[in-house]
Regions:
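Donor nucleotide-sugar binding/catalytic pocket of nucleotide-sugar-dependent glycosyltransferases
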Residues: 1-28
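A short, well-ordered alpha-helix in the C-terminal region of glycosyltransferases
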Residues: 35, 174, 181, 188-203, ...
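A conserved mid-protein helix/loop that constitutes part of the nucleotide-sugar donor-binding site
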Residues: 44-67, 165, 173
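Short, structured helix-loop element that forms part of the nucleotide-activated donor/catalytic region
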Residues: 67, 76-103, 188
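Aromatic "clamp/platform" in nucleotide-sugar-dependent glycosyltransferases that forms part
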Residues: 109, 128
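A short hydrophobic beta-strand element within the catalytic core of glycosyltransferases
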Residues: 123-124, 139, 146
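Short hydrophobic beta-strand element within catalytic cores of glycosyltransferases
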Residues: 145-148, 158
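Conserved acidic donor-binding segment of nucleotide-sugar-dependent glycosyltransferases
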Residues: 160-161, 165-172, 181-186
Length: 222
């Protein structure tokens, strides 16, 4: 990704009690934004941001949410994006589950995704193929660890147990195990959250990436 991420814009520092704008939802602190979303402070919240289609791994993620529900686990999924009916739509029944289940908080497409990262604990990004996924960079910059598939791009940003977890694409059981691990290891997730931002600021900051790209071009010229 030639652009990297703007770590000043994607920063949790913009979301504090002091930044709450009266009458404007999704501003302020994690607690305030969760309240806007009808999520409680105690909820463990996974987030997905992107096109809600099959090749983003959404059928597998839905299967995991159904399994949590069956086991009586009150795990929340914050879903940000659009359902697509033409290109690679979800399996029958999965869209309905995601739209109607009380453990799924569906907010549709959002031009500013930062408040939703603030409300979440872990990004789930079970995509089958990516270039260099902006959403994983953005999550990291916001201090959110990620569960990603072992594919190009994702596995360059996420290092196992440092700033997230990695599992094989299209493997719903493996995804479920990683999600369960996150829920059972909340203290580790807090450490990973801090490390997540550090990794992005260190390696994928916009200026850093531009500088590296420029140096590559200079080498080619010589």
């Amino acid at each position: 990704n030639i652009n990297g991420v703007d770590v000043d814009y994607f920063s949790p520092s913009h979301f504090t009690t002091e930044t709450r704008i009266k009458g404007k939802p999704y501003t302020g602190s994690k607690q305030q934004i969760r309240k806007d979303l009808n999520l409680s402070d105690d909820d463990f919240v996974f987030i997905f941001i992107g096109r809600i289609v099959g090749d983003k791994g959404m059928n597998e993620l839905t299967a995991c949410m159904k399994k949590f529900k069956k086991e009586g686990k009150d795990i929340k999924l914050l879903l940000v994006g659009r359902f697509e009916s033409e290109l690679d739509p979800l399996d029958a029944g999965n869209e309905e589950f995601l739209r109607t289940n009380e453990n799924v908080c569906f907010v549709g497409y959002q031009s500013d995704v930062r408040p939703f990262f603030v409300a979440a604990d872990v990004l789930v990004f079970p995509s089958y193929r990516e270039g260099f996924p902006n959403v994983v960079l953005q999550a990291g910059a916001m201090g959110i660890p990620s569960i990603v598939t072992d594919i190009n791009g994702c596995n360059e940003i996420i290092k196992e147990d440092l700033n997230g977890k990695i599992f094989p694409p299209k493997d719903a059981d493996a995804l479920f195990r990683e999600m369960e691990w996150c829920i059972d290891n909340k203290d580790r997730i807090k450490v990973m959250a801090l490390q997540s931002r550090e990794v992005i600021v260190d390696k994928f900051r916009q200026e850093e990436v531009w500088e590296a790209t420029l140096n590559e071009y200079r080498k080619l010229e010589n």
